A protein has these predicted regions:
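Feature detects amphipathic, helix-rich regulatory segments
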Residues: 1-199
Length: 199
């Protein structure tokens, strides 16, 4: 059993233990429905965290069954995969929108760093213990038991340390994206030269 209250690697200047907090002290279930003022152009697909307006809805009235999904909110997607055995949470960092009522949406109720929590709640190593005890298996996916989820505990750093960690991983993702683009460009150049430099 790991009783550590601090990570093995930390940024300089941070020495305090991380605080044990119930997730119900950080998030509350949001049941806020779309009042009809948000159109299908603001529909967010949880699987890819993108706006997707080509969803078929029978009527504009049906859009009122959708939940509002604001920046900082998290939603549970119960599909299991090799990477996420019990499903996963995703955080909205793309803009205010709406999601289907099939997703459980939670809203932060304390000050927190958006970037830090994006990485924390999508970290299978951290969330596996939480989700294994707060989900139940159904056909092809897991259902979240809200009360069990909100009763689970999580070690949380100060807001200052959250910001430092969130910024660090956000910067790494930015660098990865830049290098992936360069790699794709080099692959295209190679393909072009392979076609043109041989007779």
């Amino acid at each position: 059993m790991n009783n550590r209250k601090t990570p093995r690697i930390r940024f300089k200047g941070f020495t305090d233990d991380w605080e044990q907090r119930k997730l119900g002290e950080i998030y509350a279930r949001s049941g806020e429905k779309n009042d009809g003022s948000v159109g299908i152009d603001r529909n967010i697909t949880v699987a890819t965290m993108q706006f997707k307006d080509d969803v078929k809805v029978s009527t504009t009235e049906y859009l009122k069954t959708y939940y509002t999904f604001n920046v900082g909110d998290i939603a549970f997607e119960g599909h299991q995969s090799k990477e996420f055995r019990f499903g996963r949470f995703v955080e909205n960092d793309i803009g205010n929108g709406i999601v289907s009522h099939i997703f459980a949406v939670f809203r932060p109720i304390v000050e927190y760093d958006l970037k830090f929590w994006k990485y924390a709640i999508n970290n299978e190593r951290l969330m596996q213990r939480v989700l294994s005890r707060s989900t139940k298996a159904s056909t092809m996916m897991h259902d979240l038991v809200t009360d069990d989820f909100l009763n689970e505990s999580f070690l949380v750093p100060t807001i200052e340390e959250q910001r430092k960690i969130g910024d660090y991983f956000s910067h790494l993702d930015h660098l990865i994206t830049l290098h992936q683009r360069k790699l794709e460009k080099l692959k295209l150049i190679k393909k072009s030269f392979l076609e043109k430099m041989f007779v």
